[in-house]
Amino acid sequence: MTSSIKITDNSRELNGPVSREKLSSILNEIFNKDEPIPSSVELVLAQLNELSSKHKFIVNVTKLNANNVNTADFSVDSYIGSSWNDKSDGAFHYQIPLGSGQPDTKRILLVSVYWILL
């Protein structure tokens, strides 16, 4: 039995200070290094702050570990409510599969980036 995780992005458009492609590139580059997650979050925030001084950013990371991919059964639901301006504020959710030293182990990071225009 093979398990798979699918992340759906329900956002209609990415109206942030960075393109979807650029943000994906930043997240892949930083989180695929062998750094502790808190350090990686700080690096992402530093790059985002360089790209826009007009926004505040929040980065949330959820790490999923499956010790046995044949029996892993994940179900993760996450919801957020906001009272922000849909034209200038928003969120981006991204999945990053991580390499593993063991073939029967699956590790995935679920990364959410939120921004609010000042």
UniProtKB/Swiss-Prot annotation:
Its main location: cytoplasm. Keywords: Cell projection, Cytoplasm. It is found in: Cytoplasm; Cell projection. Transmembrane segments: none annotated. One of its GO terms (cellular component) is cytoplasm. InterPro entries: Tctex-1-like_sf. Belongs to the TDA2 family. This is Topoisomerase I damage affected protein 2. The gene is TDA2.
